[in-house]
């Protein structure tokens, strides 16, 4: 079985449901992304439990956006819980991002997938790409809802920095389009965990991606 490029955004509250969905879809995933809903609903220990159940990397999508000391305090506990990667905002500046990177692998938001991102984030995307190129994080977040923006970001980003793209499915993006535009990984949430058959939904997306890589 070829390595997956699919990341499950497990945006649910309930611990048992989260573990059940993670276990049944794990064969088709590269990683699982946890966000505030699951951490608030189930506690930080859910990161440890998901790793135990699936053996997959865990991305903590906290979008850290605070002063360096606060970012450092949060990241320390999240990495201790077993997270492999943390997502942080770049717009708060180099020092705040470096505080997270000192502790573990970091993914920087350079552009988001929702319509409102065009108001304040997209106008500074070039600056955020420059920051990423200088700091060399594991990866950056770019919008699968706008493949042309993924292509734009890829063309200006150092090749060793991965692109992870949310917005596939419920937000309107297509997995294969994101990959063809230059994404390394595709992040999907509701189209998998909201499906009547999450495993089958994950399998279909896994195969869609494989057709274009």
Swiss-Prot record:
Pathway: Pyrimidine metabolism; UMP biosynthesis via de novo pathway; UMP from orotate: step 2/2. Pfam families: OMPdecase (PF00215). Keywords: Decarboxylase, Lyase, Pyrimidine biosynthesis. Substrate binds at residues 11, 33, 61-70, 113, 166-176, 189-190. One of its GO terms (molecular function) is orotidine-5'-phosphate decarboxylase activity. The keyword Lyase applies. InterPro entries: Aldolase_TIM, OMPdecase, OMPdecase_arc, OMPdecase_AS, OMPdeCOase_dom, RibuloseP-bd_barrel. Transmembrane segments: none annotated. One of its GO terms (cellular component) is cytosol. The active site is at 63 (proton donor). Belongs to the OMP decarboxylase family. Type 1 subfamily. Catalyzes the decarboxylation of orotidine 5'-monophosphate (OMP) to uridine 5'-monophosphate (UMP). NCBIfam families: PRK13813.1, pyrF. Homodimer. This is Orotidine 5'-phosphate decarboxylase. The gene is pyrF.
């Amino acid at each position: 079985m070829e390595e997956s490029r699919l990341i499950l955004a497990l945006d649910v509250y309930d611990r048992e449901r989260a573990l059940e969905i993670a276990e049944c879809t794990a064969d088709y995933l590269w990683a699982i992304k946890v966000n505030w809903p699951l951490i608030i609903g189930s506690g930080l220990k859910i990161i440890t439990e998901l790793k135990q159940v699936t053996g997959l990397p865990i991305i903590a999508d906290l979008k850290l956006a605070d002063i360096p000391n606060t970012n450092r305090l949060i990241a320390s506990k999240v990495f201790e819980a077993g997270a492999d990667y943390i997502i942080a905002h770049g717009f708060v500046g180099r020092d705040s991002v470096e505080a997270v990177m000192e502790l573990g692998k970091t993914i920087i938001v350079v552009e988001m997938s929702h319509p409102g991102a065009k108001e304040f984030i997209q106008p500074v995307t070039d600056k955020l790409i420059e920051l990423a190129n200088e700091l060399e994080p594991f990866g950056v977040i770019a919008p699968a809802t706008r493949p042309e923006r993924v292509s734009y970001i890829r063309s200006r980003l150092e090749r060793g920095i991965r692109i992870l793209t949310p917005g596939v499915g419920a937000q309107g993006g297509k997995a294969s389009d994101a990959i063809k535009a230059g994404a390394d990984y595709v992040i999907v949430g509701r189209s998998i965990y909201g499906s009547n058959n999450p495993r089958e939904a994950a399998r279909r997306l896994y195969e869609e991606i494989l057709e274009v890589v």
